[in-house]
Swiss-Prot record:
PANTHER family: PTERIN-4-ALPHA-CARBINOLAMINE DEHYDRATASE. It catalyses: (4aS,6R)-4a-hydroxy-L-erythro-5,6,7,8-tetrahydrobiopterin = (6R)-L-erythro-6,7-dihydrobiopterin + H2O. GO terms for molecular function: 4-alpha-hydroxytetrahydrobiopterin dehydratase activity. This is Putative pterin-4-alpha-carbinolamine dehydratase. Its EC number is 4.2.1.96. It comes from the Bacteria. It comes from Cyanothece sp. (strain PCC 7425 / ATCC 29141). Keywords: Lyase. It is an enzyme of class 4 (lyase). The keyword Ribonucleoprotein does not apply.
Amino acid sequence: MAQLLSDIEINSQIGQLPDWSVVGQEIQMVRKFKDFIAAIDFVNKLVEPAEAAGHHPDIAISYNKVTITLTTHDAGGLTQKDFDLAQVISQLSRIWV
């Protein structure tokens, strides 16, 4: 099982991810796209990196707004896996916005 990060580690890493915020024991990113199709295209691009990492985000779609939430459920909070995948998602989101 992945090891939980300390508050100091979380604060350090979230500072390197300006698109993300800490919400309780999760990190979250919200992105708006030009329309529903662009939002769905972006979400579809997340499948491969999530599968490769063996770590899957919670995703909510509301028309052109996508909310992505990461936490490591089996560890009960935030681990390095969350921040690694957040970095990949941030890079992908810059292509689609």
